[in-house]
Amino acid sequence: MNVEKIMHDLEAKHPGEAEYLQAVREVLISIEDVYNQHPEFEKVKLIERLVEPERIITFRVPWTDDNGEVHVNIGYRVQFNGAIGPYKGGLRFHPSVNLSILKFLGFEQTFKNALTTLPMGGGKGGSDFSIRGRSDAEVMRFCQAFMTELYRHIGPDEDVPAGDIGVGGREIGYLFGMYKKLTHQYQGVLTGKGLEFGGSRIRPEATGYGALYFVQQMLATRGLDIKDKTIAISGFGNVAWGAAKKATELGGKVITISGPDGYIYDEAGIAGDKIDYMLELRSSGNDVCQPYEDEFPGSKFVVGKKPWEVKADIYLTCATQNELNGADADMILAQKPLCVAEVSNMGCTAEAVDKFVAAEQLFAPGKAVNAGGVATSGLEMTQNSIRLSWSEKEVDEKLHYIMHSIHEQCVKYGKRADGYIDYVRGANIAGFMKVANAMMAQGIV
């Protein structure tokens, strides 16, 4: 495999798709040696097939606001790879959504889902619609309009979307209601549903919970644990909320959250009512974290900056892609942390990842450390299929087992001769080999 030639061809086909090209390059560099040991892969152009989505669906979404004005957004569904199961991946509603971002997310999702050990392919979708400042009625009308096209392309054995940025329980409910009305079928076609209509326990917290289980396993490789460690978290949505809850439960102290407006530093620790308040911030729709300072005296709001300048033992990106760059990595490395994990999808730039690995920092890539969300979505699919609902304890135990298994796969493929575990390489190779073997078995399709 010639990585540079493949990337040159991709860049010519997909100019300007920076996020997608970044994600592909990272994986290709990691798997190059292993790929070259399998000439049968080259014969069937496996890489060339793997890096292109199987299908991209694009559609207009016309809807009417509360004043009667018509708006038109763009809807997408990228069905990236279905070799090991139905396409599975979230829907994102945010003005930044474009094809490059969704292709990168779908590509990453393919390997992340493979790591979970569950039979799920990779996909991603969404729209450039923003829920910010919109009424419940407007959000409902948009979701219904979005589903009037999407329903043709999804199903419990075909493609099972979930939530992502801008798509929480409310939006999933509206989407599911419209799907049911259009198809006259009550199926497990979406995950992240409410408990009253087929959802799974701990799904909202699952990404954060799973991340802390993974970090716990990483620290254990160096004889450490989370207890009494300080933790800097970015974001204040579901991922950050779940991470803060589980970190506190495991004895750690969360000292930061952040938003587009800046970050909160709370030396006393973000626990109890403070964690619950994160949900209020999210549900306000204002996308700011400054009100936390007013609510909890003693905390400090730092305007326009990211929390990476705060000294902590553990750093977790929980907001969005590429939120931690090379300069941020230098700042973090100077603090001599125990662990860094990109709990958000591709939360670190390529430069930042390279710096962490070069410094032999304990570093967890998103496709491994944040797989708890989609793993629990897979468990929701299973519960829907067998018409049963598991207890919180049962789901949490299964999630813990899955994250332990993912960690074992990363160590198997990522441990170097000198003992350092390159989790980026390990996760990429483990996910790739499962998908590649499935594609080989199914022929050139």
Predicted segments, located by residue:
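Glycine-rich phosphate/diphosphate-binding loop of Rossmann-like nucleotide-binding domains
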Residues: 191-194, 199-309
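Glycine/serine-rich phosphate-binding loop and adjoining beta1-alpha1 elements at the start
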Residues: 94, 113-227
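Adenosine-phosphate binding glycine-rich loop
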Residues: 2-23, 218, 333-445
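Rossmann-like adenosine-cofactor binding region
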Residues: 262-362, 368
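Flexible, glycine/charged-enriched surface loops at secondary-structure junctions
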Residues: 21, 37-44, 117, 154-163, ...
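Structured beta-strand/loop patches that form or line metal/cofactor-binding pockets in enzymes
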Residues: 41-71
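Conserved active-site and cofactor/substrate-binding residues in soluble primary-metabolism enzymes
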Residues: 1, 15, 19-22, 26, ...
